């Protein structure tokens, strides 16, 4: 979990380094995402992971195929107009819930570990290279 914490911190440090008026500026992602949209995207997947972990803990989880593109579009549509302070708070709360749910599991679970990794450190690492570039582009 050291990677999860380190990458989470880097992601937020990069976003925090942006001037407030640039956090919502489109261009981070080709489809017009901003850094705020990225934080909302990450937070939404962390929230989804928290739900899955609760289902694993209660024995109601059933693995199923996920349409990632559809979920990404749904998350973006639902969070795009939310103010950045609320987006940030949602992401932090979702991460805390996910980690708390993971730690409350009575026994280890490969499926839980997979969700933690995919929603957390692997997901952060997927987005960090472009975020680093975007921060540099906006800083010029």
Please give the residue ranges for each predicted region:
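Short, charged, low-complexity loops and linkers
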Residues: 1-3, 31, 76-80
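Alpha-helical bundle segments that constitute or directly flank the non-heme di-iron/ferroxidase center
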Residues: 1-22, 44-54
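Hydrophobic packing residues in well-ordered alpha-helices of helical domains and bundles
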Residues: 1-8, 84-91, 117-120, 124
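Short hydrophobic/aromatic-rich motifs at helix boundaries and adjacent loops
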Residues: 7-8, 22-25, 67-72, 98
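Short, contiguous alpha-helical
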Residues: 25-70, 103-140
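Acidic/histidine-rich alpha-helical segments that form the ligand environment
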Residues: 71-111
